[in-house]
Amino acid sequence: MSVSPIVIKVGGALLDDAAAMTRLFLSVKDVQATRPVVVVHGGGPLVETLMASLGLKSTKIDGLRVTPDEHMPYICGALAGSANKQLCAAALASGLTPVGLSLLDGNMVVCEPLADQYGAVGVPSTADAAFLKSVLAQSTLPIISSIGSSPQGRLLNVNADQAATVIAELLNAELLLLSNVDGVLDGNKALISALNANSIAQYASEGVITDGMKVKVDAALASAESLSRPVYIASWAADITDILNKTTGTQIVPTTLAAENGNAGEI
């Protein structure tokens, strides 16, 4: 793949905003004219609504959803089914050619259970990129849900930020983590332009970066370190080109680049 792909992770709340989905996919269409794009998604709000309607309790530990094995049929249906197909339909309506997938398809990603206390929650790692590269070669838009599988065939629920990170590692791609926030905010709710490991640790110790945002930032930092390139946390309402041009959002900068840049900016 001669041009570096872009992996875009979208939060599940996007599913409740049809106009935002349209804006995002039109922006994707513009970028896809010159670079391959992959979308990875979660669906937390959809899962929570389904769990509540079924009378099933949904809890989190440190921002990660606890997933009993008996909940997996419903979570799999919500993420790999409803959420994935809603996004595929919106992409199709925007003139794209979506292909709905999950982490386990094509042996792209393999997962292991995180820990007993989390239940069927998976830790993903890269496996084989050949299938995904062949899909991208057809000028399609892979839209990948965060449902994975262990080597023994146990379905596992993977945090969507971590799912996007592993797909970016699989393709050596740039990674954008998009949600309904403009980026990482400081204690005064002002946008932080760039963070590295040291500043993340400082903000976390001050209680500024917590819970789901801490999971997001940690996943972004791990990917930035692995890829030796910045990872971007931004709003799905922003233009993708603007994010890549660093005019909006928060860059998560790997240690090597942070050292080269010294103490510039927020780093």
Swiss-Prot record:
Pathway the protein takes part in: Amino-acid biosynthesis; L-arginine biosynthesis; N(2)-acetyl-L-ornithine from L-glutamate: step 2/4
Residues carrying the site annotation Transition state stabilizer: K9, K216
Compartment(s) of residence: Cytoplasm
EC category: transferase
SUPFAM superfamilies with a match to the protein in the record: Carbamate kinase-like
Kinase listed as a keyword: yes
A Pfam family that the UniProt record links to this protein: AA_kinase
Protein name: Acetylglutamate kinase
Native source species: Alteromonas mediterranea (strain DSM 17117 / CIP 110805 / LMG 28347 / Deep ecotype)
